[in-house]
Amino acid sequence: MLIEIGHFSLVLALIFSVLLMVLPSIGLYQNKSSLAQLSKPLVWVQGFWITISFIILMSAFLTNDFSVKYVADNSNTQLPILFKASAVWGAHEGSLLLWVLVLSIWTIAVSLFSKRIPSDLLNLILIILGAISFGFLLFLLFTSNPFERLLIPPLEGRELNPLLQDFGLAVHPPMLYMGYVGLAVPFAFVLAALIRGQLDSTWLRWTRPWALVSWAFLTVGITLGSWWAYYELGWGGWWFWDPVENASFMPWLVATALIHSLSVSEKRGAFRQWTVLLAIGGFSLSLLGAFLVRSGVLTSVHTFATDPTRGLFILLFLFIVIGGSLVLFTWRSHLLQKSNQFSLLSRETGLLINNILLITAMFTVLLGTLYPLILDTLNLGKISVGAPYFNAVFVPIMIPGVIALAIFPFVRWKKDSVSRLTSLLRFNWIGISSLILLARFVITNNIYVLIAIGLFIWVTFHVIILLAKRIRTKSKFSFAFIGMIVAHLGIAVFVLGATVTTQLGIEKDIKMSVGESQNIAGYDFVFNGVKPHTKDNYSGFIGDISVYSGANKIAQLAPEKRYYQSGMPMTEASIDPSLARDLYVAIGEELGGGAWSVRIYYKPLVRWIWLGGLMIALGAFFAAIDRRYFVRAKS
């Protein structure tokens, strides 16, 4: 009975999404405020029924209700309770329900925290978000019902994918979805402004905090996904350029351009057409990501479904969103054309260069992701586009962007002079060059690492200058300024960590017998053997490896080889972490005679990658709570 209530709750949510689209629209059209004001209560009621549905599905997992097909396919009685809870979004149907739940949370948040926005515009925004909810609820109910019953329930369920039986996957998808789905909010703000023809700087100020928060969550989600892949998959890498990784990275690049474009559009009135197209593009790419994950066109550890019918539904929805948005943009584009002159050397130019680089980088990732799919669809052959392409094309595009983020905060709006900038920054360039030269002799002669060190010093020096200037002029430290500083430092930290660990990391695949020692990067790894290891949801082997630095024992590592109920083997690495380096060990197969295949990694500064990602997200959260976003609009 409870399962039927869960299904019926989704039906009610669909009905209320229709009411949310229709009744306030009639109220706005006929100028009946009583109908228009129904948008807020309808948002709350819709969210209530979606939440009830989600709670009931989770209770089905926690109580081992194998009469539900989705539960029987993705859980069993031996699964730990944490993974039973996270199994709710471990496959296609439940992850789509999570998507709808997150969308309802964002919609409620907009209705709750947008009191400064004129009621007519807010009602229109909620109508647009209701229409998006309607599309996904329709998809969920007619192609992906998580409450489908089995006529004859099994005594035991199958199993949650062993890759997902990990704490990282319990938190990574919700954070990623908060970012993915959150891009619907700036999209709805932009569409509402286009429909109303209210395209002044006010709507830009209202849109930017929502764009910042969704971008911050997307950053956290991508960072957690990278961290999970690093320690869980056993291959020691932190980014594989997997097509589904790219599907989350592309909207992140566009959203990065969006938050910068919103800034210049709000302050200077420039790039408004850019801003509108970026808001449309960001959400469209999140829908494209949903299509790639759920259509079956990709095979990946991240994909959920292999049903082309589901993919066609999302593809149709994507075409409606993009097509309708572009038609609306074309209709209102004349209102976005504002003459705003600025010189070649100005902060506007810097932000324009930033956007061009980010969008160019996005298209290189899009090409590398979709090109193999297009060739396969047209029966022109099968190819694989991997890390060599992305590293060769993407990285050179982004290096100028990192340099620019350290220069253009010093450049004045509208017009500046080379002589002023040279005078302001010349001593810093001398100091930075000296430090890079010192690093060349003291640390490494690797050109890529030296470039990364230079970029890190460059950004750090200029952050210090900005702080000193604020202190000297007794200017206020706004949250927006603090956010910019933290996020830009985060990018520098990330770039340094990613470059150093990629260029100076060491990897060895070796055969080790009991008592044997292997020296890597000045550390001695002593293999003490392997013993059987069993838990409720798996059995396998656990290794025993001691790590010494000279005569001092610094770590005891216990890598595992697990075999789950499905028979799927999993390699669980053991890591000795620090901010300076990670020592990473994974065991492979038994080679006979007590010897095992062992993979050892030395990963310098690898933690800086995720530290940088979290700093970027923290900076965005700081910027989103800046005071100017909470000033009530005048009637």
What role is predicted for each listed range?
Residues V11-V22, L28-Y29, S95-S226, G234:
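A conserved hydrophobic secondary-structure block that centers on an alpha-helix together
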Residues M1-S33, I50-I52, F66, P243-P251, ...:
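Contiguous transmembrane helix-bundle modules in multi-pass membrane proteins
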Residues V45-L62, G135, F217-L224, L285, ...:
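A generic, lipid-embedded transmembrane alpha helix
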Residues D509-R599:
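Soluble non-transmembrane domains of integral membrane proteins
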Residues I50-D73, T77, S86-T107, S111, ...:
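Transmembrane-helix bundle segments that line or gate the permeation/cavity pathway
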Residues Y29-I50, L112-S133, I195-A216, W241, ...:
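Membrane-interfacial loop-to-helix junctions in multi-pass inner-membrane proteins
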Residues M1-S9, K32-A36, S59-E93, N145-P173, ...:
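Membrane-interface interhelical loops and short amphipathic "cap" helices
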